[in-house]
A protein has these predicted regions:
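Long, charge-rich C-terminal accessory regions
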Residues: 268-283, 289-379, 391
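Intrinsically disordered, polar/acidic, low-complexity terminal segments
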Residues: 1-37, 41, 53-90, 180-182, ...
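Membrane-interface micro-motifs in multi-pass membrane enzymes
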Residues: 90-134, 159, 290-324
């Protein structure tokens, strides 16, 4: 939260704000759908609620705080829908901790407004959506299905991968639902498919792919198979990294006794969701694998870090639910309470966890490498306490002041002295003709803006 006040906009943040101003909000939505992308919710948010669209650069810090608040709300709603009151608070805190401790890219997915609102906000919304589905399945109340339908319309317009994953979840629910109770799920699935179709049918999608000179879309069987193979390898490699350091495995092992107690008195919603551990594990793994496929089919590239943030969120939720499902299955099979972990195992794990969190793997023993960790939280503290975030913030503010103070139409700016890993996503370049530089220049009412070579006097 502290670093939110050191965050600064980049690329699309300026681009959306500058493009929407001359057209107006309503006209820009139609233009964006026709010429750039069909993600109607994201288009609306990035122009309607973007502080830069109103010239309010000084309020950019609100974005990461709002997205974090949405993530907390989503986690709380999901835990409240599945657990009894005494367990909701601890479960929410645990879920958020496990997500944030290995968050793939805070810079691109949280502190960059465009990435956060297009992707992480959809993940937070998906948690609320899952909570609504759990309540609808339990109560059968029309109000819950209506609320789920309204949120479905919103989420289908955020980004295509999140939308496709949610459609997959609905299809699985539809297939598993009882024949006499299938109608509401059928309506919800049809609504999701219709909204996804509207987003995918946007002419702007083709224009965008052409503008970035994307490779030809996967159209032949061997190209599709190659994309599937690459996605499978990339997903497997990501899973290896997420599990390989042991943080998630050790944390889950410490939770097994608590899961055993929950399994003795589960809520109906949790019992219904986890009654088939093998199927739940397969679906959770399938969703993660499937999430890597679209970018390989479209542009033959892995998912960008901002999308991997959402995939990791899906993975952690699926992992915890699957772990609980297997523990509950074992408790039912043994027909007795689960034995607690031996004291020496608990103590060893509790002693190891802080060491694993603090390590930076600085094998070269360099001063610059201190605190540069794969653990997101440790890296964030490093950027904050080392002063890098403050220096980055001061340099960005000095740029804004210089641009506002000069009447010159063409301005060269000094390079940033530091690029903290937690905050820095992208910067303008030395080439003033690139679109990022042009969007930056338009925001400050300049003709051209560029970054000067290091050592150049302003």
């Amino acid at each position: 939260m502290v670093l939110a006040f050191r965050s600064h906009p980049a690329l699309d943040d300026f681009g959306f704000a500058g493009a929407a101003r001359p057209l107006g909000w309503w006209t820009f939505q139609a233009w964006e759908y026709q010429h750039w992308q069909g993600t109607y919710t994201t288009n609306a948010l990035l122009t309607g609620l973007n502080p830069l669209a109103y010239g309010a650069l000084e309020y950019y810090w609100l974005s990461p705080l709002l997205v974090l608040a949405a993530l907390v709300l989503g986690a709380w709603q999901l835990c409240a829908a599945l657990l009894n009151p005494p367990h909701r608070g601890p479960a929410t805190a645990l879920l958020l901790m496990l997500v944030l401790v290995q968050f793939p890219s805070p810079a691109e997915g949280l502190y960059w407004l465009t990435g956060a609102w297009a992707y992480l906000l959809s993940g937070a919304g998906a948690l609320c959506w899952g909570a609504l589905l759990a309540r609808a399945a339990r109560t059968r109340l029309p109000s819950h299905f209506i609320a789920a339908g309204m949120l479905t319309v919103v989420l289908m317009g955020t980004n295509y991968v999140t939308a496709a994953l949610l459609v997959g979840v609905l299809l699985m629910i539809l297939l598993r639902s009882e024949a006499g109770r299938r109608t509401p799920w059928l309506v919800l699935t049809a609504l999701a498919l219709a909204c996804l179709g509207v987003a995918l049918a946007a002419p702007g999608n083709a224009h965008r792919l052409a503008s970035v000179q994307a490779p030809q879309l996967a159209s032949s069987p061997h190209v599709v198979l190659a994309a599937v193979a690459k996605a499978g390898v990339a997903a497997s490699y990501a899973l290896l990294n997420w599990l390989g350091n042991g943080l998630l495995l050790a944390g889950t092992l410490l939770l097994v006794p608590t899961m055993g107690k929950l399994a003795a008195h589960p809520t109906p919603a949790l019992q219904r969701l986890t009654r088939s551990p093998l199927l739940l594990s397969a679906v959770a793994l399938g969703l993660v694998m499937a999430a890597f496929l679209p970018t390989y089919l479209m542009v033959q590239l892995p998912p960008p870090p901002r999308l991997r943030n959402v995939i990791y969120l899906v993975f952690v939720v699926g992992w915890l639910l699957s772990a609980y499902a297997w523990v509950a299955w074992w408790v039912r099979r043994q027909n007795r309470a689960l034995l607690p972990l031996p004291a020496y195992v608990r103590l060893a794990l509790l002693a190891w966890l802080p060491l694993a969190l603090a390590t930076d793997h600085n094998t070269h023993l360099s001063h610059a490498g201190i605190g540069q960790s794969y653990v997101t939280v440790v890296q964030a503290y490093r950027d904050w306490l080392s002063g890098d975030a403050a220096r980055y913030d001061a340099a960005q503010r000095a740029r804004y002041a210089a641009l506002r103070a000069t009447a010159a139409p063409n301005v060269g700016l000094p390079p940033l002295p530091v690029q903290p890993a937690t905050l820095f996503y992208y910067d303008i370049s030395a080439n003033s003709t690139l679109w990022g530089n042009q969007a930056y220049a338009r925001f400050f009412n300049k003709k051209a803006v560029w970054v000067q070579p290091a050592g150049t006097k302003p």
